Amino acid sequence: MPKYIAIALAGLAAFTAAQPPAALGQGGLDRRLQAAKRIECTFSVLGTGTWDKNVPAITVTPAEIKANFFDINIDEGTAEAESAYGASFISVRYESGYLHIMQMSDAGPLYLTTVLARAAGEGKLMAVHTRIEYSPTVIPGFTSRPEMYLGTCTIANPG
């Protein structure tokens, strides 16, 4: 995919995120997201950053990852994540139609998932997942460069 398309996608994501949800008639989604106790996410597009001969570059590829969060408590700023890699510290913040879920590993990496109070069809909400991690060696199947995923989440409150 040409570099200008990747730049256009990043610009579109930033523009979309900058729009207040209530202004677009999405106040109900805003309230549902604020009350969420469980979020199930699927991400299908990946932008991977690197420094090619010390020049920043990004590649965009299809992806298939899931991220599920439960016991979300906005008042306490906490949540739990389903993970094959063990527990990590999670901090949650909700503000003006954005639910931010920040995971910090004691090994250094930072993961941030943001769910927007924006409809993405079929009961889904727009979402962005980033992984800030760097390793000099690229290991297939593991994060070794900064990554940004675009996808959707559903509110799956127990009921």
Predicted regions mapped to residue ranges:
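Bacterial N-terminal signal peptides that target proteins for export
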Residues: M1-A8
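Bacterial N-terminal signal peptides
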Residues: A8-T16
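Boundary at the C-terminal end of the N-terminal hydrophobic targeting segment
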Residues: A18, A22-G25
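Short, solvent-exposed loop/hinge segments that bridge or flank secondary-structure elements
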Residues: D30, A35-E80, P109-T114
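Hydrophobic/aromatic beta-strand elements that line small-molecule binding cavities or substrate pockets
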Residues: F69, L112-A120, L150-I155
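Contiguous, well-ordered beta-strand patches that form the walls/edges
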Residues: E76-Y111
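Internal, hydrophobic beta-strand segments that form the core of beta-sheet-rich folds
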Residues: M126-E133
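Edge beta-strand at a domain terminus
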Residues: S135-G159
